[in-house]
From Swiss-Prot:
InterPro entries: KH_dom (IPR004087), KH_dom-like_a/b (IPR015946), KH_dom_type_2 (IPR004044), KH_sf_prok-type (IPR009019), Ribosomal_S3_C_sf (IPR036419), Ribosomal_uS3_bac-typ (IPR005704), Ribosomal_uS3_C (IPR001351), Ribosomal_uS3_CS (IPR018280)
Pfam short name (any one): Ribosomal_S3_C
The UniProt record lists the keyword RNA-binding: yes
Keyword tags: Ribonucleoprotein, Ribosomal protein, RNA-binding, rRNA-binding
Cited function: Binds the lower part of the 30S subunit head. Binds mRNA in the 70S ribosome, positioning it for translation.
Protein name: Small ribosomal subunit protein uS3
Protein family according to the UniProt entry: Belongs to the universal ribosomal protein uS3 family.
GO aspect biological process, one term: translation
Organism: Rhodopseudomonas palustris (strain ATCC BAA-98 / CGA009)
GO cellular component: cytosolic small ribosomal subunit
Length: 235
């Protein structure tokens, strides 16, 4: 089962927590969930070049707090904070409430599965050899402290007539071990031959304590490729 299921979903409530953190009654739940989907769609569309790995949405009383995890916070903020103010207004139009946007810098993008997958997809679109792109990503992750990494690429790789899947793995990636801190990311490369899918699993070590916030705490300490210091509060 661990081989098939999304590793993040399998570990929710054990050593991972949800990206949407709020409670709503029966009548409000659908509306707020739809707002979350819209917010993420708009932010990913507006911040294509900002290397956004994760968007966390929290809803304290009559407010909406959005935390953007990005490897390029300067692109998100813009000149003198102009871009982040525009984003705050767009999110406020969706939620009809006060919006606070925080930026969290990812110090080691090579250890973030989503950013690694997007990087490989972009290289495939630029016609870089898929084996070279995969090997380079594996070497970078292992050099920066990952205990294991696995990368799958599928589709008409290299313009082949028949679609196939190629994968590389180095180190350990224990998908069945619930205490394992495994990051997972997916991206799609739109090439002239069709679409190619990229999947990345990165094993960063084991979390022995039962703590849903453990992964966030490790990112805050800089151990998981992130830093929780907000670069700007747009409230």
């Amino acid at each position: 089962m661990g081989q098939k299921i999304n590793p993040i979903g399998l570990r929710l409530g054990i050593n991972r927590t949800w990206d949407s953190r709020w409670f709503a009654g029966k009548n409000e739940y659908g509306k707020l969930l739809h707002e979350d989907v819209k917010i993420r769609e708009i932010l990913h569309k507006e911040l294509k070049q900002a290397a956004v790995a994760r968007i966390v949405i929290e809803r304290p009383h009559k407010k909406c707090r959005v935390t953007i995890h990005s490897a390029r916070p300067g692109v998100v903020i813009g000149k003198k904070g102009a871009d982040i103010d525009k984003l705050r207004k767009k999110v406020a139009d969706i939620t009809s409430s006060d919006v606070v946007i925080n930026i969290v810098e990812i110090r080691k993008p090579e250890l973030d599965a989503t950013l690694v997958a997007e990087s490989i997809a972009q290289q495939l679109e630029r016609r870089v050899a898929f084996r070279r792109a995969m090997k380079r990503a594996v070497q970078s992750a292992m050099r920066l402290g990952a205990e294991g990494i696995r990368i799958n690429c599928s589709g008409r790789l290299g313009g082949a007539e028949i679609a196939r899947m190629e994968w590389y793995r180095e180190g350990r990636v224990p998908l069945h071990t619930l205490r394992a801190d495994i990051d997972y990311g997916v991206a799609t490369a739109f090439t002239t031959f069709g679409t190619c899918g990229v999947k990345v699993w990165i094993f960063k070590g084991e979390i022995l304590e039962h703590d849903p916030m453990a992964q966030d705490k490790r990112m805050a300490e800089g151990d998981g490729g992130g830093s929780s210091r907000p670069r700007r509060d747009a409230a």
